[in-house]
Regions:
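Glycine-centered loop/turn positions within well-structured domains
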Residues: 18, 127, 155
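Non-cysteine beta-strand/loop elements that form the S-adenosyl-L-methionine
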Residues: 112-126, 181-182
Length: 182
């Protein structure tokens, strides 16, 4: 009996600018932040031929050690999957404060299928997000999310609720709706 891969979770990098206190990057004493790995298309080609990619239903990037937006080749890799398989669902989880607004606009245009998405992990508002999402610059995050949404991308705001931000849930819901998060 052969088993066909339908969903692929990729780690595009182990790089992240954030220092979230419960992240594996912060809690694993064996993790070396000085080694910076980036997935390359050559590595995809070594493991997946065009037929395998054409049969995938979904590719998503949700970093265990790095933020996919920090990957030097993330956009190229996602473009490659979409070019081989135009109906594939593409997804990504991010803190949103990496890359430039033009990069996020390109991603928003690429993520044009109905089920494509980016989950922005935003834990509160400007005064509370960086309490857990250490080193995440609020203005950059919001500008990147706007660029992605304005380019047609489907965005989800994912908020971890803590004592320090629980009073902001209603405000976050309103701002998320106003910005075009789904």
């Amino acid at each position: 009996m052969s088993r066909e891969i339908k969903v692929l979770h990729l780690e595009s990098t182990d790089v992240c600018q954030a220092a979230c206190p419960l992240c594996s990057r912060e809690t694993n004493p064996d993790f070396n932040k000085d080694i910076k790995n980036h997935l390359h298309i050559d590595q995809i080609l070594q493991h997946f031929d065009n037929d395998a990619i054409a049969n995938l239903n979904k590719v998503f990037m949700c970093g265990n050690y790095g933020d996919p937006a920090a990957g030097k080749n993330t956009l190229d890799i996602l473009n490659y999957f979409r070019n081989i398989n135009p109906s594939i669902t593409l997804g990504m989880n991010t803190n949103g404060a990496l890359q430039s607004t033009p990069w996020w606009s390109k991603l928003g245009k690429l993520f044009n299928n109905p089920n494509d998405y980016v989950v922005f992990s935003i834990d509160g508002l400007e005064d509370t997000n960086s309490i857990y999402r250490v080193n995440v610059i609020w203005e950059k995050l919001i500008n990147n999310a706007k660029a992605y949404i304005n380019a047609g991308g489907s965005a989800h705001w994912d908020m971890l609720i803590y004592r320090h931000n629980q009073h902001q849930v209603n405000a976050v819901e309103k701002i998320a709706r106003d910005m075009g998060f789904s």
